[in-house]
Amino acid sequence: MTILRYISLFLLVTLLGYGQAPQKPHRIELPIQAEIPVRGLYRRLVSQQIEGFPTPKRMKVLSLYLSSSLIHRINQARACHDDWFRLHPKNDEKAPSTWTEFGLFSGADDRGHPQAFQVEKTESDEDGSFRVYVRLTEGPQEKPWNWQVAVVVMSEEGKFVINDVIFLRDKDVETESRLSELLTVGSDASHWVGYGNKNATP
């Protein structure tokens, strides 16, 4: 009888242990899961660089990593881009640099063509989203330059996706900006209305 009691106690402890063990690793794994779409996107970005809007073919691939909201914003900005060229058929004005000289996921000017990336850290926000900090590198091997962006990742339909990119302030960039905001500059939904509209920034 004593042996049976010991066996029963052992089985009970074992079952309770199995029931509790997965909870802690699950919390640990969430930041790692949040990094997956970020690594996927930037791996493609450095292997085949994007300037301005991705082609429809490339956008289809990149959409795997993006939230439905960000995809919608990019599509509206592309429609606004087309509307701008419709309004300027003679091409007598320079198109907004956000469309032509800007890396949507990396930054403007000499930050548009990163050649390498490294995920540095991941932080959770109170709303359940994550910020994945990525260091990007561009320039010649003997003298490259680095900068950092914060990629906002959220859960959507059971998977993590990128919802925004924050271009962080540093010694070369005076103000912080967001991709979601830059996509709306000068636009009213899919129509170009100029920099004087409520969505525009100086």
Label every model-predicted segment.
Residues 1-7:
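Bacterial N-terminal signal peptides that target proteins for export
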Residues 11-19:
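Hydrophobic h-region of N-terminal signal peptides that target proteins for export
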Residues 20-25:
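Bacterial Sec signal peptide processing site at the extreme N-terminus
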Residues 26-97:
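Core segments of small alpha/beta cavity-forming domains
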